[in-house]
Curated annotation (Swiss-Prot):
Molecular function terms, GO-annotated: chromatin binding; enzyme activator activity; identical protein binding; protein homodimerization activity; single-stranded DNA binding
Residues annotated with N6-succinyllysine modification: K122
Record protein name field: Single-stranded DNA-binding protein, mitochondrial
One example of a Gene Ontology biological process annotation: mitochondrion organization
GO cellular component terms, A-Z: mitochondrial nucleoid; mitochondrion
Keyword RNA-binding found: no
Organism encoding this protein: Rattus norvegicus (Rat)
Amino acid sequence: MFRRPVLQVFRQFVRQESEVASSLVLERSLNRVQLLGRVGQDPVMRQVEGKNPVTIFSLATNEMWRSGDNEAYQMGDVSQKTTWHRISVFRPGLRDVAYQYVKKGARIFVEGKVDYGEYMDKNNVRRQATTIIADNIIFLSDQAREKPLNG
């Protein structure tokens, strides 16, 4: 008499647990980054033995704001903060294009994902590194085109 309700509750509990577990497996998430800025250095291509090569460069993004109260907001001092991002390009076609055409000072748009990785430095100390794994790069300017022509 008491067994049957306990068995029903147990079955219902197991079913709910399995539904929760399966929904976690099927749950979608998003790791997406979009950056618009200027390249800080010409790219380098690195290859660790047994791994695919990677093109690496830095990208600066700027955040600007005015200080002051609401009335003086238009007249306030402009402050700026620059954030540097490490961009890594692994996709073969994009990696080669980035290595060849990304140049210091160029204005580019990068789409990708954030990756928090670890590596061993030259002193054999474990370090953490945050990088943007690029899967799309749009070239918005060419440094050579922006320089004024003399003469």
